[in-house]
Each structure stands twice: as structure tokens, then as C-alpha cells.
């Protein structure tokens, strides 16, 4: 029987905040880190920096749009679509590997983050889940930025450095990653709602970027 998603989330958050860095690294699903993993760690660190900078700019520019973490309605666009928190759990918290492997996520095996032939299925699932998260946010951000670019006020746009950081980490996780251009839908276009949605997504994505960066750090140290 698979443990409830809520319990898994609480467990991983407790571990991330209270367990020793190297101790946790030793207990994660094992893999052999190589130069590619170090490169992926650099990409994840750059992603965290750029999304933090983008969020800070949005909070300043959209100060009248309720853009602080205390004011927004938090939303996770990856809910029920990916399993990053569960897939990247330490082994002792995920004794039933089949519970995770049964998730409908395509395994990636052609990225540079793992040494070919030396990654466990759970480690591959962890990185595959991270890739799926990035892909979902990439689609949302690019569609949103396309709308912001036609805003007559031209008040705010997404930082290209953040979009590039997403692309680079996705490519490191999957060599076949492709960027799909997004065209804005003009039906029911509301720039105010778009900017509020931007704040919500940036806050959620920064939290996910923190998780991704920690996971990459643990994998690189293991």
C-alpha cells in the first residue's frame, strides 16, 4: 500500500530542514556522480538565482497586485501531474519502490546528469520527475510572457535569464528536450489576472527551484 502523498511531503520537508547534509546524501537512492552531475548542480544553482531575482523584481514592479507570499493564493501546477517530492525521497521513506515506479512519468536516460548504466531506477525517476516539473513551468511561463509582451502598459516581462536557465537544465536532463514556442490566446485576455497569476507561479516555482537545487546538491555529494 502506497503512503499518502501528504505524509510523504511532510516527511521530506522535515528531512530537508533537520537532517545533516551528507547523512541525507548517503541515504538517497544511489548513483555514481560524474562531471555531468556537477554541471547539473551548476544549472540548478543558476536556476535558483534567476528565479529569485525574477520574483524580487516582480514583487517590486507589481507591488499593487498582492504579490507577496502572504497575499497570494498558493497554487501548485504540478499537483497530481508529477511526483518529484515522492520520487526523490530517501530509500528508508520509500520502501515500496513500485509505488513510485508506477507513476505515469516517462523515464529519461539520455541526459548528462547521470553516468549511463550506473543509475538506479528510482534515481532516474527522481530526475525524470524534475524534468517534468520544469517542462510544465516552462510552458506556463512562455505562454504568460507572450501575453505580457502585448500588454499596452508594458509593465513587466519575464527575465530571459530565468527562461534560459530552465532550458539549460532541461537539456542537461534530456538531450532531446525541445522548446515549444507559445502563442498567447487573445480570448478573454485580462492583463491584471495575468500579472496576479505571474506572482503565484513565481512563488511556487521558487519553492520548487529550492527543492531541485537541494536534490542536485545531495546527488552530487553522494
From Swiss-Prot:
Entry GO terms, CC: interleukin-12 complex
- Lineage, top-rank taxon, reads Eukaryota
Position of the signal peptide: 1-25
**Keyword Glycoprotein (UniProt):** yes
- Cysteines engaged in disulfide bonds, as pairs: 40-113, 67-199, 88-126
Subunit comment? Heterodimer with IL12B; disulfide-linked. This heterodimer is known as interleukin IL-12. Heterodimer with EBI3/IL27B; not disulfide-linked. This heterodimer is known as interleukin IL-35. Interacts with NBR1; this interaction promotes IL-12 secretion.
Localization: Secreted
Q: Name one Pfam family in it.
A: IL12
Give me the glycosylation sites of this protein.
Answer: 42, 96, 110
Q: What gene is this protein translated from?
A: IL12A
Kindly list the biological process annotations in GO that this record carries.
Answer: immune response; interleukin-12-mediated signaling pathway
| Main localisation | secreted
Q: Describe its function.
A: Heterodimerizes with IL12B to form the IL-12 cytokine or with EBI3/IL27B to form the IL-35 cytokine. IL-12 is primarily produced by professional antigen-presenting cells (APCs) such as B-cells and dendritic cells (DCs) as well as macrophages and granulocytes and regulates T-cell and natural killer-cell responses, induces the production of interferon-gamma (IFN-gamma), favors the differentiation of T-helper 1 (Th1) cells and is an important link between innate resistance and adaptive immunity.
What family does the database annotate? Belongs to the IL-6 superfamily.
Lineage, highest ranks first: Eukaryota, Metazoa, Chordata, Craniata, Vertebrata
Protein name per Swiss-Prot or TrEMBL: Interleukin-12 subunit alpha
Organism from which the protein derives: Equus caballus (Horse)
Amino acid at each position: 500500500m502506497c503512503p499518502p502523498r501528504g505524509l510523504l511531503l511532510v516527511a521530506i520537508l522535515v528531512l530537508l530542514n533537520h537532517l545533516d547534509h551528507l547523512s541525507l546524501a548517503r541515504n538517497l537512492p544511489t548513483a555514481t556522480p560524474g562531471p555531468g552531475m556537477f554541471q547539473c548542480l551548476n544549472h540548478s544553482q543558476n536556476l535558483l538565482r534567476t528565479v529569485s531575482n525574477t520574483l524580487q523584481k516582480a514583487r517590486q514592479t507589481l507591488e499593487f497586485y498582492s504579490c507577496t507570499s502572504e497575499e497570494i493564493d498558493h497554487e501548485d501546477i504540478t499537483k497530481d501531474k508529477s511526483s518529484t517530492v515522492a520520487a526523490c525521497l530517501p530509500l528508508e521513506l520509500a520502501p515500496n519502490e513500485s509505488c513510485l515506479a508506477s507513476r505515469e512519468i516517462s523515464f529519461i536516460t539520455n541526459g548528462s546528469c547521470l553516468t549511463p548504466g550506473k543509475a538506479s531506477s528510482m534515481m532516474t525517476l527522481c530526475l525524470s520527475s524534475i524534468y517534468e516539473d520544469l517542462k510544465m513551468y516552462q510552458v506556463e511561463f512562455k505562454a504568460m510572457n507572450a501575453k505580457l509582451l502585448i500588454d499596452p502598459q508594458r509593465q513587466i516581462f519575464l527575465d530571459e535569464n530565468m527562461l534560459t536557465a530552465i532550458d539549460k537544465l532541461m537539456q542537461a536532463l534530456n538531450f532531446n528536450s525541445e522548446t515549444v514556442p507559445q502563442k498567447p490566446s487573445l480570448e478573454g485576455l485580462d492583463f491584471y489576472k495575468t500579472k496576479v497569476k505571474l506572482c503565484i507561479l513565481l512563488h511556487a516555482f521558487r519553492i520548487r527551484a529550492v527543492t531541485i537545487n537541494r536534490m542536485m546538491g545531495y546527488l552530487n555529494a553522494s
